[in-house]
Regions:
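Short beta-strand and strand-turn-strand segments in soluble, beta-rich domains
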Residues: 72-81
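Asparagine-centered strand-capping/turn motif at beta-strand->loop junctions
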Residues: 46-48
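Short aromatic-acidic-glycine turn motif
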Residues: 62-73
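Extracellular/periplasmic metallocenter environments
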Residues: 1, 28, 81-147
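Beta-strand signatures of extracellular beta-sandwich domains
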Residues: 55-59
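Envelope-exposed proteins and targeting segments
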Residues: 15-19, 38-42, 52-54, 83, ...
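N-terminal pre-domain segments of enzymes
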Residues: 1-15
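N-terminal edge beta-strand
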Residues: 11-41
Length: 147
C-alpha cells in the first residue's frame, strides 16, 4: 500500500533526518532540490506559506505525470496518499518516506496549473557511501608546490 517507484511510506522510528520545505504562491518549493541516501527514511516537514492551497507529492517522473493527469480530469478529487501532503494556506504537514531506490525522483504540487507553472523539485537518491575515507579527504592544494 502506498509503494511507488521512489520508495515506500516510512516509519517515524526510523527517521534519520528532517528536511523542511516551504511552498509559496510563486508556485515554488524551497529548497527545490534534495539529496538523500538509498535506504534513508526522511521526515519532510512541509509548510504552505502562500494564500492558495498547495500540495507536495513524491514519486518518479511517471508517478507524478500520471497523478497530474488524474488531477486535471478530476480537479476536486479527494486523495490522501502516504507520499503526499495537501495543505491550505498557513498549514504545516509532514511526509515520512523511505527511499529504497537509487535515482532521480520528483516532488511536485499537482493543484491544477501549479505543476505546469514550475512547482516541482528533484530528489536525488544516491548509494550509501561504503568508503568513509573518501568523505573526509580534502582536495590537496598543489598551488604552492615547487620543483
Amino acid at each position: 500500500e502506498g509503494v511507488n517507484k521512489a520508495g515506500k511510506p516510512g516509519v517515524a522510528a526510523n527517521v534519520v533526518r528532517t528536511i523542511h520545505i516551504t511552498m509559496s504562491d510563486k508556485n515554488r518549493f524551497s529548497p527545490n532540490s534534495v539529496k538523500v541516501k538509498q535506504g534513508e527514511t526522511i521526515r519532510f516537514v512541509v509548510k504552505n506559506v502562500g494564500k492558495k492551497k498547495h500540495e507536495m507529492v513524491i514519486g518518479s517522473v511517471e508517478d507524478i505525470k500520471a497523478h497530474n493527469e488524474m488531477m486535471q480530469r478530476f480537479p476536486g478529487m479527494e486523495h490522501d496518499e502516504p507520499n503526499m501532503v495537501d495543505l491550505e494556506s498557513g498549514q504545516k504537514g509532514e511526509i515520512i518516506w523511505q527511499f529504497t531506490e537509487v535515482g532521480q525522483f520528483q516532488f511536485a504540487c499537482l493543484v491544477t496549473g501549479h505543476f505546469e507553472a514550475g512547482m516541482k523539485g528533484v530528489i536525488t537518491v544516491v548509494k550509501p557511501s561504503t568508503n568513509v575515507k573518501a568523505k573526509v579527504q580534502t582536495p590537496v592544494d598543489h598551488s604552492t608546490h615547487q620543483h
